[in-house]
Amino acid sequence: MAAKIFCLLMLLGLSASAATATIFTQCSQAPIASLLPPYLSSAVSSVCENPILQPYRIQQAIAAGILPLSPLFLQQSSALLQQLPLVHLLAQNIRAQQLQQLVLANLAAYSQQQQFLPFNQLGSLNSASYLQQQQLPFSQLPAAYPQQFLPFNQLAALNSPAYLQQQQLLPFSQLAGVSPATFLTQPQLLPFYQHVAPNAGTLLQLQQLLPFNQLALTNPAVFYQQPIIGGALF
C-alpha cells in the first residue's frame, strides 16, 4: 500500500515539473541575453555556436565596446600635455607682472636696494669683510667706496678731490674732539689748514707757536711764565 502511494506522488511530481518546464535549445540566446547588459545585446546576436566558444565571443564583444573610447582618451591626454607649457608660461608672465607692479609702487626702495647691492653681495661672499664694513661709521664709507656712495654726497659729485681730502681729515677731527692737546701736536695737519692763515707769515708764526700752545693746554701757569711768548705776543 505504501509503495503505491509513493509511486502516485512521484507521478504527480513529474507531471507538474513537465507542465512548468522551459526547454532551451543549443543555439538559444535567452540565457546569455539575460546575463549581459543592454548595450551588448547586438554584439551577442550571433552567439549560437558551441558553449565552449561563448566566453571568447563575449570577451570580443566587451572589447569591441571599449576600444572606440580609447582614441578619445588618448587625444584628450595629448591635448593636456601640450597645454602644460602654455600654463607654465602664463604663470611666469603673471609673476613678472606682479613684480613689475611692486617695483612701480615702491620705486624709491627698489632703487636704494639696487645701490646697496654690491655690499649685499659682499656679505654673501665674505662675511668677515662685510661685518667689518658694518662697524665703520657711515661717513667713512665713501672714502673706501667713492663710486657707490657718490650720489649720497653733493660735494663728492661736484669736487671729488675736496671731498676725499675731508674724508682724510675725519680721523683727526675725531681726535680733536677726544684730545685737543694731541690734536694740536699733529704736524701732518698743517698743510691741510693753510687756507685758514691769511698769508705765509701768519702760517709760519702758527707753526712756531705750536709747542707753546701745547704747553698752554697742559700747564697754563708755566705757559704764561715763558719770556719768549711774552716777547712774541706783546
UniProtKB/Swiss-Prot annotation:
One of its GO terms (molecular function) is nutrient reservoir activity. Residues 1-21 form the signal peptide. The keyword Repeat applies. Keywords: Repeat, Seed storage protein, Signal, Storage protein. It comes from the Eukaryota. InterPro entries: Zein, Zein-alpha. Coiled coil: none annotated. Belongs to the zein family. Zeins are major seed storage proteins. The alpha zeins of 19 kDa and 22 kDa account for 70% of the total zein fraction. They are encoded by a large multigene family. This is Zein-alpha GZ19AB11.
